[in-house]
Amino acid sequence: MLDSRARLLLKALVERYIADGQPVGSRTLSKASGLELSPATIRNVMSDLEDLGLIVSPHTSAGRIPTARGYRLFVDTMLTTQRDPFSVAGQMARIAPDQPLKVISNAAHMLSSLSQFVGVVMAPRRTSVFRHIEFLRLSEKRFLVIIVSPDGDVQNRVIFTETDYTASQLIEASNFLNSHYAGMAIEEVRERLKNEVEALRGEIATLMQEAVLVSSEAIESRDEVVVSGERNLLAVSDFSSDMGNLRKLFDLFEQKAQLMRLLDVSSRAEGVRIYIGGESQVIPYQELSVVTAPYEVDGQVVGTLGVIGPMRMPYEKMIQIVDITSKLVSTALSHSK
């Protein structure tokens, strides 16, 4: 689509704009590119790039800035790989492998600290499996279900029933579930209970079905996104001048539902993935870019992490930060088992 001269000028323009945030004029571009071209020739090339939708002229300046399409071409074809600017061994110490949730929060802080933008980490997906379940009577027709996951995490849920079960019935139900279904996926347990309900006493079967339902909800509800560094965006001129957009961004980080969807989609990709402008369609914010990568435990993808910042971000650096952090988290979580 572009000849070598146009590619060099576009690359120089994007790099210059990322560096100082100012629209790039023909004289500045001539110096930045290192090409011995007249300002008139450069203006002609810039006009062609503008016609292709790769750069645009802000109303307040005669210079040009990249569009989302221009950034995409730059990221896909023009990035130069630099040496790893971070000590992997040094950063490993910042992600303590003692507790999985501590690893996740430390990783989010590290991402925001290194990028000076927002770090996000989706906590490892939990399989809907229980290791042990117990019932505790709280009051008439009101019971506490205690669910222990395979990694030792304990969840408590209160259920209300139409029947007031006795202590012996509660013990019978928990013993049956633990002896027959411990270690199985919750969905499989639900299906088996449907098939075996006739062989069980009706009241007990109903209690167990309710317990399995709340167990599934309890385990799945632990999916979460850890966000760090939101205040970093206050120092980014691309955002700080528009309080309306800033409020939308902070709502995004507080609600987290859209972040969860984006990170979930990203977990199915291999390696680093970059969303520029509104490309993700999950976070429809044109001035935002997101760099993500999945992380693993023992070779299985269990979550995603990334950096969220302005479209005008140093992509080479962000890619390295995200890629290295995903590897560190994978190592830390695999070793913490």
Curated annotation (Swiss-Prot):
<dbReference type="Pfam" id="PF03444">
    <property type="entry name" value="HrcA_DNA-bdg"/>
</dbReference>
<dbReference type="InterPro" id="IPR036390">
    <property type="entry name" value="WH_DNA-bd_sf"/>
</dbReference>
<dbReference type="Pfam" id="PF01628">
    <property type="entry name" value="HrcA"/>
</dbReference>
<dbReference type="GO" id="GO:0003677">
    <property type="term" value="F:DNA binding"/>
</dbReference>
<keyword id="KW-0805">Transcription regulation</keyword>
<keyword id="KW-0346">Stress response</keyword>
<dbReference type="InterPro" id="IPR005104">
    <property type="entry name" value="WHTH_HrcA_DNA-bd"/>
</dbReference>
<keyword id="KW-0804">Transcription</keyword>
<dbReference type="InterPro" id="IPR023120">
    <property type="entry name" value="WHTH_transcript_rep_HrcA_IDD"/>
</dbReference>
<keyword id="KW-0678">Repressor</keyword>
<dbReference type="InterPro" id="IPR021153">
    <property type="entry name" value="HrcA_C"/>
</dbReference>
<comment type="similarity">
    <text>Belongs to the HrcA family.</text>
</comment>
<dbReference type="InterPro" id="IPR002571">
    <property type="entry name" value="HrcA"/>
</dbReference>
<dbReference type="InterPro" id="IPR029016">
    <property type="entry name" value="GAF-like_dom_sf"/>
</dbReference>
<comment type="function">
    <text>Negative regulator of class I heat shock genes (grpE-dnaK-dnaJ and groELS operons). Prevents heat-shock induction of these operons.</text>
</comment>
<dbReference type="InterPro" id="IPR036388">
    <property type="entry name" value="WH-like_DNA-bd_sf"/>
</dbReference>
<dbReference type="GO" id="GO:0045892">
    <property type="term" value="P:negative regulation of DNA-templated transcription"/>
</dbReference>
<protein>
    <recommendedName>
        <fullName>Heat-inducible transcription repressor HrcA</fullName>
    </recommendedName>
</protein>
